[in-house]
Amino acid sequence: MLVSYKWLKELVDIDVPSHELAEKMSTTGIEVEGVDVPAEGLSKLVVGHVLSCEDVPETHLHLCQVDTGEEESRQIVCGAPNITAGIKVIVALPGARIADNYKIKKGKIRGMESLGMICSLQELGLPDSIIPKEYSDGIQILPEDAVPGESIFPYLDLDDEIIELSITPNRADALSMRGVAHEVAAIYDKSVHFEDKVLTESDKKAADLIKVAIASDKVLTYKARVVENVTIKPSPQWLQNLLMNAGIRPINNVVDVTNYVLLYFGQPMHAFDLDKFEGKDILARQAKAGEKLVTLDGEARDLIEEDLVITVADKPVALAGVMGGAATEIDASSKNVVLEAAVFDGKSVRKTSSRLNLRSESSSRFEKGVNYADVVKALDFAAAMLTELADGTVLAGQVSAGAVPTDDIQVSTSLDYVNVRLGTDLVFSDIESVFARLGFGLSGNDEKFTVSVPRRRWDISIQADLVEEIARIYGYDKLPTTLPEAAGTVGELTKTQKLRRKIRNLAEGSGLSEIISYALTTPEKAVAFTPNPTKITELMWPMTVDRSALRQNIVSGMLDTIAYNVARKSNNLALYEIGKVFEQTADPKKDLPKEIDTFAFALTGLVTEKDFQTAATPVDFFYAKGVLEAILAKLEITVQFVATKEMANMHPGRTALIERDGQVIGYLGQVHPQTAKLYDIPETYVAEVNLNALEAALKSDLVFEDITKFPAVSRDIALLLSEKVSHQDILDAIAASGVKRLIKVKLFDVYAGEKLGVGKKSMAYSLTFQNPNDNLTDEEVAKYMEKITSALTEKVGAEVR
């Protein structure tokens, strides 16, 4: 928000240096980015009256005689296309400084002496974006009453001081001059002076020409007035200066009035050419799929159902709260005008402006909020200005639909509540003084008082907001330093935090190093390495395609990290990550995804490098499985590994789903060689587990068990099996035998060869039995082995070797 200090001093009786005001505002809650003086660095710029102007043959130049308030006129050579005799212009005298500290000197152009320079606004340092289009390619023409020889600064308000405010979302009331004036008045305990305009209406009714309706809950209220017989012309210089100092380009008197009201009240407005309407029914509604609108910037916009539009005869004529349409634009031929003042849903406006990358002064205000109480006042003020500046006739009555609350908001608190929070010893008279300065109503006493908060301060709704206002106006620097009165409470980690920390410790104890990868990735990588991919949640305006979708797995990001390291000759890697993946089962454009805590690791290269004693040991499936099993064992969680060929990015013969109670909670295995080739990485093994599922499986209470005094007994068994039988099949068969004294099963040998026959393999297991209350006898162990052997023969067709 750019604030003209000249304008501000018209609204509040203050006379302090602008830099002092800026510092005071920053310390009371509204950050000031800086203070800029447009005239700074400029000198010896005066008003000139062009007495004569002759074309120089065969050139674009003009030889001018210019009165600069001296006894004799000056001869100045000028190349501007809009130079002509009789106009008042900006003259830089010899020795003058213009933009970029450029010094003007006497000189000759085509042999003709030039005693100065006739300047454009660009040459004074003003940006092209705010210069009126009629002067964008030529010199600035000053008002007719400008006096030759006088400084041009007062005529263009270049001697103004522009205070740039950085407005946070909670202080959107300061996006208007009236809001800033209230703030400054409160800081300095002054009164505000706002201009009132008397609106004169004709007997003719606006409702006879237009009708207004709302067909969306995103439009809170919509109000319109009709002004007839306007004369389109440039705005007076004071208004153009004011808009340019606020960073807005002057267009014409009608459009400039709407922008003036936007700056003054903070209420966005729009003006339509009534004669370009194809009907009288104005409807604010959601856009229809496939509708198009050419906006004022000349761009054709494809609309979607989430956009809000203003329609006439069911045709869009404006993007509500963002930008008007070119079809009903105010131009030089416009005579009859419809003025719009409305309140649109901020979220809807923000979505549309973001989707179309179309930001405007109006959209920024609707996004942060507007003052409901000023909608009617702003509309009437604009209509009154059009009678003054455009000679228009205002038709009787506003035409409106919908309503917004305009009454004050009541918030109650107590003096004790305030003093406890601020550590102060304020009395009730101090509170009365603060809210009087803010312009708020106050009733009650120190035990309980109620503040009537005007609608212009919609950021205030609870007791804490009142405390903040008291602290701001009383002065943060006056608040005493005190210790907190409330007793502290002992903190405790949540179950989720404890699990994360334990897994982190276990993973690092297994030799893994933690990384953090991006949660945003490509749509393709988002659903890779996912047993059950869901809908993709994509960003509307991603900075790059590589960071456009929320991940549904962690592994793809880990492989990017491995590829980065391998490319730099770091080949032996053991990495892990604890993070979130995002599952979307509903509409990604409307609903938030479900966040799932996930643990993943990736291994590649050598477990141990070779030396003079031992051979190198590469990472393999069983090593990766052992890492995961060791972590799960410490958590006392039992899972099942089920071979799968369904995951396209994983090796079909070296991949297993991780199941618990019949539910898939993750996977483990080798990255498919073709996928590894795409990443340009060597053989890599990965695992990914749902931490939410692990948390649910944790034992809530651990009960101490005495260490048994009785020894365990082990027996080995070698089985001849079909090569199709898996280790899990063996474990399931042994479990089916129902031997309660069996406490451990360990695979210690696997063999396949010609001696066993085609399609056969041998697997050897060590079985451990123990009775915690007594010694096991040979007969008991033999009985257990017999039951296990029978189960293996029956379930998997095993032969005991």
Swiss-Prot record:
Its cofactor is Mg(2+). Binds 2 magnesium ions per tetramer. This is Phenylalanine--tRNA ligase beta subunit. It is found in: Cytoplasm. PANTHER family: PHENYLALANINE--TRNA LIGASE BETA SUBUNIT (PTHR10947:SF0), PHENYLALANYL-TRNA SYNTHETASE BETA CHAIN AND LEUCINE-RICH REPEAT-CONTAINING PROTEIN 47 (PTHR10947). CDD domains: PheRS_beta_core, tRNA_bind_bactPheRS. Residues 39-153 form the tRNA-binding domain. It is an enzyme of class 6 (ligase). GO terms for biological process: phenylalanyl-tRNA aminoacylation. Its main location: cytoplasm. Belongs to the phenylalanyl-tRNA synthetase beta subunit family. Type 1 subfamily. The keyword tRNA-binding applies. It holds the Pfam family B5. Tetramer of two alpha and two beta subunits. Mg(2+) binds at residues 459, 465, 468-469. Residues 708-801 form the FDX-ACB domain. It comes from the Bacteria. NCBIfam families: pheT_bact, YtpR. One of its GO terms (molecular function) is ATP binding. Residues 406-481 form the B5 domain.
